[in-house]
A protein has these predicted regions:
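Non-catalytic cap/lid and distal C-terminal segments of serine-dependent acyl enzymes
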Residues: 1-317
Length: 317
């Protein structure tokens, strides 16, 4: 972690080579939704091993431009040029933020608000917040494999509407929420720390983007008035940012974070363990668990994951 954050005094991207990467077009660096990428229409083919013949696929389609998300009363979308990142990359680089503003916000008021920073992968806009009642049917035939239920879309919409009602209620605390868009030429987020490979994203977010948002929406603008949270990759980012900028933030809630320490990378100590797939044993080979089901039962081992990851890599994942 420390190695990733503390950039070595190497050359910047602007000083090394000329890199050609697709620029951000509103898709969060997702190739399958990136405007101007081309693709074919789906076709049905028959495979006959006794009579093999070439299959003709015509590239006729192009992904259209993405319309910017419109601001609303409560949700705003901010974009700034980062001088720190632009210097590192040798071209104009930008950071964006989705901002949820509190009920009763008045720019001309002297009221100042604390800031909640939600970390994670690319968010197109503030999710889980809607100002209208749910329109999805309570009962449908769409089964959610993840949660084992139907009607999940209704549940999502209802929770989002309930959050709106809570957010605007009389006694609910007033604060700002920010989601950061820090997609880059390599991925849909930067992991929110400084990196010799990606540049000073940690500094750019902490010292350029967040103060800009706070100035625009009457934030407190001091470390004691900022809190970090996130899950999975966002959990890792929340903990990393709090670790590297202890005076700029006042706490972090890291839910199910990506591995924080390579001494406990899932069930492997990368630094010391000789075998990633089995525990050391004098008697029999004991597989290292890799995944448990909702009851806590092991349903996949590290060895099982080896084949899954290998296949995924071959597919270009």
């Amino acid at each position: 972690l420390l190695y990733q954050h503390k950039m070595r005094p190497h050359l910047t991207r602007a000083q090394i080579l000329v890199f050609y990467f697709a620029t951000y077009q509103g898709e969060g660096q997702h190739w399958n939704t990136s405007p101007k990428n081309i693709y074919s229409k789906p076709i049905k083919v028959s495979l006959d091993s006794s009579n093999p013949s070439p299959i003709s696929i015509k590239i006729t389609e192009e992904i259209p431009p993405i319309d910017p998300v419109k601001d609303s009363k409560y949700v705003k979308h901010i974009k700034i040029k980062s001088e720190l990142l632009s210097e590192f990359w040798g071209r104009d680089m930008y950071l964006q933020a989705n901002v949820l503003i509190p009920e009763g916000f008045d720019k001309d008021s002297k009221t100042e608000y604390p800031l909640m920073v939600f970390h994670g992968h690319f968010p197109k806009t503030i999710g889980g917040f809607r100002t209208t009642p749910p329109t999805a049917p309570k009962e449908d035939t769409l089964f959610s494999d993840r949660f084992g239920i139907t009607g999940y879309k209704y549940i999502q919409e209802k929770e989002a509407y309930d959050f709106y009602k809570q957010w605007t209620s009389k006694n609910f605390p007033r604060f700002l929420v920010i989601e950061i868009q820090h997609q880059n030429p390599y991925y849909d987020d930067s992991y929110a720390v400084n990196s010799a490979n990606l540049g000073p994203y940690g500094d750019a977010i902490t010292y350029e983007l967040i103060p800009y948002v706070e100035a625009m929406f009457n934030g407190i603008g001091e470390g004691w008035g900022r809190f970090l949270y996130g899950g999975s990759t966002g959990g890792w980012e929340a903990m990393a940012v709090q670790t590297f900028y202890p005076d700029e933030y006042n706490g972090a809630f890291a839910a199910c974070p990506d591995p924080i320490d390579f001494r406990a990378y899932m069930t492997i100590n990368i630094y010391e363990d000789d075998n990633a797939y089995y525990y050391d044993s004098q008697f029999q080979k004991i597989p290292r668990p890799a995944h448990r089901d909702y009851l806590g039962h092991v349903d996949a081992s590290q060895y099982d994951y080896k084949f899954e990851i290998h296949a995924w890599t071959l597919l270009g994942g």
